[in-house]
Amino acid sequence: MSAIYNFCAGPAMLPAAVMKKAQQELLDWNGQGVSVMEISHRSKEFIALTQQAESDLRELMQIPTNYHVLFMHGGGRGQFSAVVNNFLGNHGRALYLVSGQWSSAALAEAQKLVGEAQIDSLNIVEKHNGLNAVVLPDLHKIDADYRYVHYCPNETVDGIEIFDELDSPWPIVADLSSTIMSREIDVSRYGLIYAGAQKNIGPSGLSIVIVRDDMLKLPSLPQSSIMDYRLAVEHDSMFNTPPTFAWYLAAEVFAWLKSTGGISSIAKINQQKAQMLYQCIDGNAFYRNGVVAANRSQMNVTFQLVNEALDGEFLKQAQIAGLVALKGHRIVGGMRASLYNAMPLDGIVALVKFMNEFAAKHS
């Protein structure tokens, strides 16, 4: 069977080595004679797995000791509400920076929960010569007392990534769902990081929260116990039964990433993958991209065919060639190739070859 390269934005492809190991261990994990899905989450064997997973993630991301690592339910959207409910008690206010669809969704959820009076927002994307560009504001010039400023460094739908570090007088809350572990960051700059698992961590149903000690002292609102960060810390992310299989796969992904050289190593490969694809797009008048070079996403490359009438044929022929899930998000259309950590360089080589041949045939 020919190789299949899955460019889905999420749930995304997992490393082949991880999938093969999970397949081998499915019916007999760790010599238990049963699947990891079938054992108690409070057994010593599973507790050892969770401890190793946290240790590996801390090592990979160089997470300081004054941060807690939580494995929670709900994905990214679950964290939209959890952040508000955990930090905005007693009429606290927050600022949301809007750079695309997902930061807009986080803003809408926050305003729904506490009202617009407690939530301010700034649109940080402008048009530069017809292309989307991020312009980060000088937050130190804003006279306000916010509990936190929220932003999304990588917008999967819009193909926009913010590489510059955000400088803020207030704690930074970041949605890293689509960029976590794809490149190195300084965790100590953040008050809280959250990420849905289904892009660079594992399957859907799990989210990772990395929260600084002092953030847990902020007044909270009444909320579901399973989304309470303080309870999650107190109970080692096991206030109730966690998504054990997703946790197991996340642990395997962390171990795989360590074995490949860690984040510094995968970041170089990710940069190479993105450069190859953007060079193909820019070097051919058949395709176009709507983002300035400085803000083009390395994880989610969006592009359009100049002749949109060929979109259907492009997707059909790509599927035949083993290049799947290239259709752009329904909101923006066009094409999108997601290049998360698990996507091998060979996948980009195959995609670029196909795109060049398709353009030559239909120009």
From Swiss-Prot:
Residues the record lists as binding pyridoxal 5'-phosphate: 76-77, 102, 156, 175, 198, 240-241
Cofactor(s) needed: pyridoxal 5'-phosphate
Gene Ontology process terms (BP): L-serine biosynthetic process; pyridoxine biosynthetic process
Binding site for L-glutamate: 42
Chief location: cytoplasm
Gene Ontology MF: a single term: O-phospho-L-serine:2-oxoglutarate aminotransferase activity
Residue numbers carrying N6-(pyridoxal phosphate)lysine: 199
Cofactor binding, per record: Binds 1 pyridoxal phosphate per subunit.
PROSITE patterns found in the cross-reference section: AA_TRANSFER_CLASS_5
Enzyme class: transferase
InterPro entries reported in the protein's UniProt record: Aminotrans_V_dom (IPR000192), Aminotrans_V_PyrdxlP_BS (IPR020578), Pser_aminoTfrase (IPR022278), PyrdxlP-dep_Trfase (IPR015424), PyrdxlP-dep_Trfase_major (IPR015421), PyrdxlP-dep_Trfase_small (IPR015422)
Subcellular location: Cytoplasm
Gene3D superfamilies hit by this protein: Aspartate Aminotransferase, domain 1, Type I PLP-dependent aspartate aminotransferase-like (Major domain)
Pathway of action: Amino-acid biosynthesis; L-serine biosynthesis; L-serine from 3-phospho-D-glycerate: step 2/3; Cofactor biosynthesis; pyridoxine 5'-phosphate biosynthesis; pyridoxine 5'-phosphate from D-erythrose 4-phosphate: step 3/5
EC number: 2.6.1.52
Gene Ontology annotations for the cellular component aspect, listed alphabetically: cytoplasm
Subunit description: Homodimer.
UniProt family annotation: Belongs to the class-V pyridoxal-phosphate-dependent aminotransferase family. SerC subfamily.
Known role: Catalyzes the reversible conversion of 3-phosphohydroxypyruvate to phosphoserine and of 3-hydroxy-2-oxo-4-phosphonooxybutanoate to phosphohydroxythreonine.
Record's protein name: Phosphoserine aminotransferase
Gene that specifies this protein: serC
